[in-house]
Amino acid sequence: MASLKDVAKLANVSLMTVSRALNSPQRLKPETLARVQAAIEQMNYVPDLSAKKIRGAHASPKTIGVLALDTVTTPFSVEITLSIEETARAHGWNSFVMNMFTDDNPDAIVDLLLSHRPDGIIYTTMGLRQVPLPAKLLTLPCVLANCESLHHPVASYIPDDEQGQYSAVKALLEAGYRQPLCLHLPEPLLATARRRKGLERACREAGVNPDGLTHRYMALGDEHYRDIPAQVLAHIHAQKPQFDSVICGNDRIAFMVYQTLLAQGLRIPQDVAVVGYDNMVGIGELFLPSLATVQLPHYEIGRLSALHIINGSEHKQTTRVASPFLRRDSMLAAD
């Protein structure tokens, strides 16, 4: 990352002149100010807020800067930032979080993040997605948590959605269910295709044709959870379901399925089994009966991402973190 000294050298001025250009530009001649500003822009220099710390203080602990895209909108992704902080503290590091929203100016947010001079950066998002990575972030050790880079080879830690769904469907089929109704997340989401791939693999291994099952995709937007009951009721005739189980794209879909089935007088799991995905924080075990689901490994993703920075890891591979199936009472046990 460019320093004040680098800017001064390029502009052929003193450090004091660069400092004045940043803090008191009115004190410089216009031509000198223009030369310094051109050097700042050319070198992508970002002012160092940490330079304002008191001189002579003890060396500060190293710091991880977390750039969090849309994570404050959901309780799930908060586990990632919590894990990063706890892991950093356990290793004598500090961390701070800079929230960014989809409609923010990313360059301004990134400059603000870098102005605090972190020793490493973790870029995390709400929901698995591919992100364009601002080039400035790559001037420091950088890792992605719950997202993948669109263009640059950068280490990333993401849920193993395919294996997680495979494990859940395999357990369902081993328990004797053969006609699941599949209610998927919206088709454009990155996790959707990966989970369906795991579902299809489990079905084929059990001798079930996945193309012969009923697949429904939720539309994008939280308001479309209200569409779930109609999708379920379309396959119930005279209170007799045309399916023996429901594979849900997440636990919120499962919640809507529970209400619909119970309102029809159907028993879970005796008449219909239900399997969710996510293991909603503090909620999954409160379903009656408790919901069998897959754990999104957000806490582990945060821990591994922090350790990547702390340990100075240099690999740039994508690491798929295990998403374990949690067997609970919404499905019968295998014979």
Language model: regions and residue ranges:
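Extreme N-terminal segment that seeds HTH/winged-HTH DNA-binding domains in transcriptional regulators
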Residues: 1-15
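Flexible loop/hinge segments that line or gate small-molecule binding clefts
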Residues: 124-167, 252, 278-291
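An alpha-beta-alpha
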Residues: 168-208, 318-332
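Periplasmic-binding protein-like
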Residues: 66, 117-125, 181-184, 240-252, ...
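Flexible loop/turn connectors
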Residues: 233-335
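Hydrophobic alpha-helical segments within soluble ligand-binding/sensing domains
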Residues: 155-182, 225-234, 296-314
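Short beta-strand elements in bilobed, periplasmic/extracellular small-molecule ligand-binding domains
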Residues: 88-99, 200-226
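N-terminal helix-turn-helix/winged-helix DNA-binding helices
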Residues: 1-2, 41-75
